[in-house]
Amino acid sequence: MESTIQPLDRVFLHLGPITIYWYGVIIGTGVLIGLWLATREAVRRGLPKETFVDLVLFAVPIAIVCARAYYVLFEWHYYSKHLSEIPKVWQGGLAIHGGLIGAVATGAVFARARGLSFWKLADIAAPSIILGQAIGRWGNFMNQEAHGGPVSRQFLENLHLPDWIINQMYIDGRYWHPTFLYESLWNLVGFFLLLWLRRVNLRRGELFLSYLIWYSVGRFWIEGMRTDSLMLAGSLRAAQVVSVTLIVLSIALWIVRRAKGWAKARYQDE
C-alpha cells in the first residue's frame, strides 16, 4: 500500500508563470488572523485601529528576512555552495526564533517611534503570535518537513489521526513523528491559556513573558524529537539552547521587573 501513497500537492495555485505554494498561503493566513485579533484588542485597549496594521507592514518582512537569515546561517555549509537557493523561502527554511528576534526588535523600534509602551504592544500581540505559529506549522506539514524520527503506521493510527495526515507523514519510504502537529497543538493550547491570563490582568509585559515561557517549554520538548534540527555543535540543538535561554531570561525579567517596581501598570490599564 505504501508504494501508492502520494504526498499532498505543495502548490496552491498557478497564475501563469507564478506559482503560489501552500506554505506561503498558510503562513499568510496565520499572519492575517493574528492581525485581526491584535487589531480588535488594540482598539479595545484604546489604541488607534491602524496601529498593528502599520506595525505588521514593517515587522512581517523583517521577521521573514531574519527567519531566513537565521536558518541559512546554521546551514551555511549547504547554502554557501547554493547561493541561488537562499531567497527561496517558499521551499521552507524559516526559523521561528530568527523571526521572533526580528519581530521583537521591530516592535521595540516601532513603539519608541510612536511613543507607545513596548510592553503594551507585546502583550496585545502575544496571543496573535502563538496562534499564528500554531497555524504556520501546517505549512511545514505541506512541505513534509519539521518532522520527528521514524515510527510505524500503526503508531500514527493509534493517535487516531486521519489518513490524509498519516499519508503525508510517509516520506522516503518511512513514516515519521508528526512533530509539526505536536507543536501546533501545544501552541493552540497556549493561545487559549494567554486569553485566560489576559483576564487575570497581569502586570504589563507579563502576558508576553508568559508566551515566551510557554512556547519555549513546548519547543524544547518537541525539538528533541526532530530529525532536522539546526545544530550548534555536535548534538547541541540550537532551538533547545535558545528555548532554555528564553525561559531563564523571561523568569528573571519577570522577577526583576516586579522587585524593582518597573511593572506597576496592569494589562487593562490605559
Curated annotation (Swiss-Prot):
Give any single GO term for biological process: lipoprotein biosynthetic process
User: Keyword annotations for this protein?
Assistant: Cell membrane, Membrane, Transferase, Transmembrane, Transmembrane helix
Q: What does this protein do?
A: Catalyzes the transfer of the diacylglyceryl group from phosphatidylglycerol to the sulfhydryl group of the N-terminal cysteine of a prolipoprotein, the first step in the formation of mature lipoproteins.
Concerning NCBIfam families, the annotation shows:
lgt
The question of whether NAD is a record keyword is answered with: no
Name assigned to this protein: Phosphatidylglycerol--prolipoprotein diacylglyceryl transferase
Q: Name one Pfam family in it.
A: LGT
The UniProt entry lists membrane topology as: Multi-pass membrane protein
Primary localization? membrane
Annotated positions binding a 1,2-diacyl-sn-glycero-3-phospho-(1'-sn-glycerol): 137
Compartments, record wording: Cell membrane
* Pathway field: Protein modification; lipoprotein biosynthesis (diacylglyceryl transfer)
| Segments passing through the bilayer | 18-38, 55-75, 90-110, 115-135, 177-197, 205-225, 236-256
